[in-house]
Amino acid sequence: MLARSGWLSLEALSEYGLSLAAVRAYVEIGFVEPLEVGGAWYFREEDLLRMAKAERIRKDLGANLIGAALVVEILERT
């Protein structure tokens, strides 16, 4: 039911090239906010895409996690 409403489970992480450790870190810094149901996290597809963009910035430019998240937020404002 959640998948039909636009929320994706942690199993979708691999489709977006995201590790569980990276997702936990993005949640910890407040870059994304999961929906928690029964102890499981669910994310909107747009949040998974935001994290994937930040991860590409980290890998391609050598930015740290907070810096990559900040770049994504700045790009979204333009």
UniProtKB/Swiss-Prot annotation:
Q: Does the keyword tRNA-binding apply?
A: no
Instruction: Tell me which Gene3D superfamilies the record gives.
Output: 1.10.1660.10
Identify one Pfam family in the record.
Answer: MerR_2
Reproduce the UniProt comment on modification after translation: The N-terminus is blocked.
Q: Which UniProt keywords apply?
A: Chaperone, Stress response
| Stored InterPro entries | DNA-bd_dom_put_sf
Q: From which domain of life does this come?
A: Bacteria
Q: List the disulfide bonds.
A: none
User: What does the subunit comment say?
Assistant: Forms a heterononamer with DnaK and DnaJ. Three copies of each protein are present in the complex.
Function (record text): Required for correct assembly of the DnaK-DnaJ complex in the resting state. Seems to stabilize this ternary complex until it is replaced by substrate proteins under heat-shock conditions.
Q: What is this protein called?
A: Protein DafA
Q: Which organism is it from?
A: Thermus thermophilus (strain ATCC 27634 / DSM 579 / HB8)
Species lineage, top-down? Bacteria, Thermotogati, Deinococcota, Deinococci, Thermales
Q: Which gene encodes it?
A: dafA
